[in-house]
């Protein structure tokens, strides 16, 4: 974490890790778990007294007092005044995460014409936004990202917790972009380069994986869900049992180039016929509607929704998902397309088991930028 005077705070909050029941629980593991539990509780429940926090978390008052003291010293938690009370005794002092005392920088590299960036509050509110034209790729693309991040950092006078970046393509957990053809990146160490250039914690993840984190943390998402991001391309992020899934090849959710059906279909940019992206991307949908004419728009959208239902039915059945969330242009996705996808999903899964699976449009704007903020919150504070 970097302060106004440019000095780095050596105290870092590590990511939340699940304790394995067969592994010896060391004191430092338990303490890290308790720190994350306290901050997670405050983040979602808001200001409360130390006694309330002890009751909510199940930790002892001594442990709570110790941890809260550390958090106040680190500038993460603040006292917010006293709770009004009519009973006897000293009124309790309320504490909360210092939501106005820190900022996060989020960057979205998935747009067709520009890289978008924002300065966000800890609650995911966009406070300032900037964008730069999207270069052709390679080194020029990296320099544009770095310049955008530095411009956003210059807009705040309070400490910045970190920088989150949502990038297209396949991204390793250490922020190495394995492949992003549209940006001409292969085995590109984006996270490492940005962290060195900015002297701040930097997290780089796939853009759809960032988006699903935003829906889970700031939206109304359930604990088992698939978010499909639909724009120039099609990609997905997965949450299972409240945990993000990335897969053994770091490519979980790369459903855009899965061929849907055996009857061919429109030619995809990858060279195959009938990929989900060729049916469903916003670019292809608008092109086909323009070719067919407005009077046939519903037929185009119905076909795309049917293909979507075919694609997600085995995923829902394999992972026992509760909902499918779509992120993309509402004028294309709401209504006919979602209705067709829902009907096809029901027809292609076990009757009576998956009938309550919901396919809906996200209500969130700036979902990748907000997801980038969640990446930083999780890494630095253990909050998700």
Question: What are the functions of these language-model segments?
Answer:
Residues 1-133, 137-159, 218-219, 262-267, ...:
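ATP-binding/phosphotransfer module of carbohydrate and carboxylate kinases, centering on a glycine-rich
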Residues 159-166, 170-271, 275-276, 377, ...:
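Phosphate-binding/catalytic loop of phosphoryl-transfer enzymes
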């Amino acid at each position: 974490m970097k302060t106004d005077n440019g000095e780095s705070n050596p105290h870092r909050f590590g990511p939340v890790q699940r304790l394995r029941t067969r592994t010896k629980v060391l004191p430092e593991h338990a303490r890290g778990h308790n720190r994350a539990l306290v901050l997670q509780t405050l983040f979602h429940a808001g200001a409360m007294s130390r006694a309330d926090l002890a009751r909510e978390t199940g930790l002892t008052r001594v442990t709570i007092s110790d941890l809260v003291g550390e958090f106040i010293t680190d500038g993460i938690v603040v006292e917010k005044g006293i709770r009004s009370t009519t009973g006897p005794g000293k009124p309790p002092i309320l504490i909360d995460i210092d939501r106005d005392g820190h900022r996060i920088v989020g960057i979205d590299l998935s747009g067709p014409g520009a890289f978008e960036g924002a300065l966000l509050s800890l609650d995911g509110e966009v406070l300032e936004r900037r964008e730069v034209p999207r270069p052709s790729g390679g080194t020029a693309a990296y320099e544009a990202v770095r310049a955008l991040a530095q411009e956003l950092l210059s807009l705040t006078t309070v400490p910045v917790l970190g920088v989150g970046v949502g990038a297209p393509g396949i991204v390793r957990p250490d922020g190495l972009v394995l492949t992003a053809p549209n940006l001409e990146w292969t085995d590109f160490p984006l996270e490492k380069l940005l962290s060195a250039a900015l002297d701040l914690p930097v997290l780089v993840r796939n853009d759809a994986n960032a988006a699903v984190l935003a829906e889970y943390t700031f939206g109304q998402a359930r604990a088992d869900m698939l978010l499909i991001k639909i724009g120039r391309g099609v990609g997905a992020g997965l949450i299972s049992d409240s945990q993000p899934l990335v897969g053994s090849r770091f490519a979980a959710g790369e459903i855009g180039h899965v061929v849907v059906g055996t009857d061919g279909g429109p030619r995809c940019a990858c060279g195959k016929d009938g990929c989900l992206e060729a049916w469903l991307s916003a670019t292809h949908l608008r092109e086909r509607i323009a070719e067919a004419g407005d009077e046939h728009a519903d037929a185009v959208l119905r076909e795309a929704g049917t293909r979507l239902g075919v694609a997600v039915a085995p995923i829902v059945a394999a992972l026992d998902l509760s909902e499918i969330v779509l992120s993309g242009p509402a004028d294309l996705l709401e209504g006919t397309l979602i209705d067709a996808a829902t009907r096809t999903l029901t027809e292609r899964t076990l009757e009576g088991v998956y009938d309550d699976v919901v396919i809906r449009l996200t209500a969130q704007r700036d979902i990748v930028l907000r997801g980038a903020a969640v990446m930083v919150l999780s890494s630095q504070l253990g909050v998700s």
